[in-house]
Regions:
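ATP-dependent adenylation/nucleotidyltransferase module used to activate substrates
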Residues: 1-150
């Protein structure tokens, strides 16, 4: 069973519904890191209620100033418009965001007895987001396997 890191956006919603349909969704965790699109968390809550999947929110929004000038967290930085392949989309990078969320989710997964954490990174993301690359996922998986006594 998996704990799903669930923003409430399209990618993680598809992942949650897929795992739920397979009987593998143990719970869902949204992380409020001070993002502008925090309204997605309410969508996540509603979808989890609809499915009967336990839902929690980790509020780390007080860390927002530490993330620097990302257009997703800093209201003084404009949100770019256009194709994700465009150079200007790099302003949407929140440094180390997935590592932070995966660490929090791994701790929660251990606490609730889930045997894995799932997050919706995909190949369309990793051209812009370094923490969506396959080598990142593999490295984090290796680290998480040794960070807890099983």
């Amino acid at each position: 069973m998996a704990l799903v890191i669930y923003s409430g956006g399209l990618d993680s919603t598809v992942l949650l519904y897929k795992l739920f349909s397979e009987g593998k969704a143990d719970g869902a965790l949204s992380v409020n890191y001070g993002q502008r699109h925090v309204k997605e968390i309410e969508c996540a809550r509603q979808n989890c209620a609809r499915l009967g999947v336990p839902f929690e929110v980790a509020d780390i929004s007080s860390l927002r100033p530490l993330f620097g000038a990302s257009s997703l967290t800093d209201y003084s930085v404009g949100v770019p418009d256009g194709n994700y392949a465009d150079e200007n989309m790099k302003s949407t990078v929140v440094p180390n965001r997935n590592m932070i969320m995966l660490s929090i989710a791994a701790a929660r997964a251990i606490a609730i007895g889930a045997d894995s954490v799932a997050y919706a990174a995909h190949s369309g993301d990793h051209a812009i987001y370094p923490d969506c690359r396959p080598e990142f996922a593999e490295a984090v998986e290796s680290a998480l396997k040794i960070c807890h006594y099983t």
